[in-house]
């Protein structure tokens, strides 16, 4: 079968389209083989190509998000059958450690991600466990392959950040950095569902205008404005109750300056770098909570799928690229031009 692979880490020139062996014909008892119709890119895929501190088995197939059609099921699969239209939850737990038994699947000692630790979705067919698959809900208008592929990773990540970890409440002020990416746009929608007052930033006025149309209460250009000062002015010097920062080094200091007393800063990554610091005296005096968040558990995934079916969390697709042009999709993501998810159409 055809797949986009990397044979070494480095730049985007390492990505190539080639033939790879198809998944084994014999499935495990709870495994499902899915024919991929569309795959969506995430910053994780850029990090994989550049070289995460992992031992890859080359050639490695990137891609965490995907949607497609069930081709075959293992003997003990009870909830799916061939022909079902499905989307994938890329975070795979082993269901045997103490964290899994407590329902904290994203803390699993053997947690693995499609496209990172395992072969990914930039291919024609993948095998994943039954519990990592959801039937695509029926919506009007129908959810297309691109939207279904764009849904899982960013929505699950944003849901856990805002609902489970930061516990955003009605009337709170939430600051979201870097509107335009999939996680930040999902966070925007979830924060509005929670009844928050929403401040978002971007260096692109076009993205800020789009965010306003999507429900942002205030938009700030972090290329021309001092974000912490603006947030303090907007909140009568109180600061934000919650700051959503997945940018990292470039925004960390400003995030803390914008954070109010008793505030919560929640992070799922560091696209500009992982090394940050702060004065511990400010941490305990202002009684801040600094929260990490990664993906989500099975209950959270079921909840976001349910809400998608209710029409609440429909993802935003920036652009769809043909399978043959996947490298161009990576390049668009790397330039930060997107407003929503960059998707690759694998098959019709």
Question: What are the residue ranges of the model-derived segments?
Answer:
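Mid-domain Rossmann-like dinucleotide-binding core that forms the NAD(H)/NADP(H) cofactor-binding site
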Residues: 142-225
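NAD(P)H dinucleotide-binding glycine-rich loop of Rossmann-like/cofactor-binding domains
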Residues: 35, 92-178
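Glycine-rich beta-strand-centered segment in the early N-terminal region that forms part
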Residues: 23-40, 52-101, 139-141
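Short amphipathic alpha-helix with an adjacent loop that forms part of the alpha/beta core around
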Residues: 226-236
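Glycine-rich phosphate-binding loop and adjacent beta-alpha segment
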Residues: 194, 202-205, 247-316, 345-348
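C-terminal capping/lid region of NAD(P)-dependent oxidoreductase domains
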Residues: 1-4, 237, 312-316, 328-348
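N-terminal Rossmann-like NAD(P) cofactor-binding module of classical short-chain dehydrogenase/reductase
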Residues: 87, 243-244
């Amino acid at each position: 079968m055809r797949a986009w692979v990397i044979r070494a880490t480095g730049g985007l020139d390492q990505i190539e389209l080639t033939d790879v062996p198809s998944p084994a014909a014999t499935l495990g008892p709870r495994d499902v083989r899915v024919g991929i119709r569309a795959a969506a890119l995430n910053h994780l895929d850029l990090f994989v190509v550049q070289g995460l501190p992992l031992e890859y088995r080359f050639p490695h197939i990137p891609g965490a998000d995907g949607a497609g059609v069930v081709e075959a099921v293992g003997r003990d699969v009870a909830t799916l059958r061939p022909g079902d239209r499905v989307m994938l939850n890329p975070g795979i737990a082993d269901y045997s450690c103490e964290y899994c038994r407590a329902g904290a699947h994203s803390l699993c000692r053997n947690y693995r991600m499609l496209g990172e630790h395992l072969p990914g979705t930039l291919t024609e067919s993948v095998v994943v466990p039954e519990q990592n698959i959801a039937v695509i809900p029926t919506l009007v208008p129908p959810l297309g392959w691109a939207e279904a592929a764009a849904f899982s990773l960013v929505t699950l990540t944003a849901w856990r950040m805002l609902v489970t970890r930061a516990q955003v409440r009605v009337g709170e002020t939430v600051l979201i950095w870097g509107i335009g990416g999939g996680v930040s746009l999902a966070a925007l929608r979830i924060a509005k569902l929670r009844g928050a007052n929403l401040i978002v930033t971007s260096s692109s006025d076009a993205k800020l205008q789009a965010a306003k149309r999507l429900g942002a209460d205030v938009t700030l250009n972090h290329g021309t404005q001092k974000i912490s000062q603006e947030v303090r002015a907007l909140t009568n010097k109180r600061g934000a109750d919650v700051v959503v920062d997945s940018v990292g080094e470039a925004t960390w200091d400003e995030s803390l300056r914008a954070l109010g007393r008793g505030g919560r800063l929640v992070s799922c990554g560091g696209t500009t770098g992982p090394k940050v610091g702060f004065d511990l005296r400010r941490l305990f005096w202002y009684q801040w909570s600094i929260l990490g968040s990664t993906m989500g558990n099975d209950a959270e995934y079921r909840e976001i799928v349910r809400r998608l079916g209710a029409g609440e969390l429909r993802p935003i697709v920036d652009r769809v690229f043909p399978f043959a042009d996947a490298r161009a999709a990576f390049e668009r993501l790397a330039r930060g031009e997107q407003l929503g998810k960059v998707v690759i159409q694998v098959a019709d």
